[in-house]
Amino acid sequence: MEYRSLTLDDFLSRFQLLRPQINREPLNHRQAAVLIPIVRRPQPGLLLTQRSIHLRKHAGQVAFPGGAVDDTDASVIAAALREAEEEVAIPPSAVEVIGVLPPVDSVTGYQVTPVVGIIPPDLPYRASEDEVSAVFEMPLAQALHLGRYHPLDIYRRGDSHRVWLSWYEQYFVWGMTAGIIRELALQIGVTP
């Protein structure tokens, strides 16, 4: 697939035709969710945030809006929508949820479910000052280009795991966020 010419219709049909493969037991049982907000445009965008430098965990990192599932959430989808509203003022009613990707185990002990949703192009994003220092949009075709991600094998507590690294403008995209974007690319049939 030529990544430079990805339209929203191309993305939607490929996402809905190719179902994700879940092929292992989760390591973590605490639940969290992130919203992968796809901005509805002729050439769609991918909305990302940069976390506040004042946070205890993952300070300053590029991330999707999201967080832990709490007792008030009816589902992981509800948690992703709640967190997106809290972090960047995306109303849940403005998100057209189209599906989920397989859960990812985080190094902080959560099983994170990526929820894919389409959002309107004219939403007035408002970053939560406590959690988010920046909100930015990356062209989806660029985000899904697998050649932009570089592997790094990390050894922690005797185990090895691979993380992915990339840049977009001044933003360093890596770790779970880069891994989720790569999984989304693979889900829609982008070949390495």
UniProtKB/Swiss-Prot annotation:
Q: Which terms does the UniProt entry file under GO BP?
A: nucleoside diphosphate metabolic process
According to the entry, every stretch annotated as the Nudix hydrolase domain falls at: 29-160
Per the Swiss-Prot or TrEMBL annotation, the motif Nudix box is positioned at: 67-89
Q: What is its EC number?
A: 3.6.1.-
Q: Where does Mg(2+) bind?
A: 83, 87
Xref: InterPro entries: CoAse, NUDIX_hydrolase-like_dom_sf, NUDIX_hydrolase_dom, NUDIX_hydrolase_NudL_CS, Nudix_NudL
- Write out the entry's keywords from A to Z: Hydrolase, Magnesium, Manganese, Metal-binding
This protein's superkingdom?
Bacteria
Q: Does the keyword Manganese apply?
A: yes
List the cofactors: Mn(2+); Mg(2+)
User: Which GO terms of the molecular function aspect are on file?
Assistant: coenzyme A diphosphatase activity; magnesium ion binding; manganese ion binding
Q: What does this protein do?
A: Probably mediates the hydrolysis of some nucleoside diphosphate derivatives.
Entry similarity comment: Belongs to the Nudix hydrolase family. PCD1 subfamily.
Q: Which PANTHER family match?
A: MITOCHONDRIAL COENZYME A DIPHOSPHATASE NUDT8, NUDIX HYDROLASE
Its protein name is Uncharacterized Nudix hydrolase NudL
* Organism field: Shigella flexneri
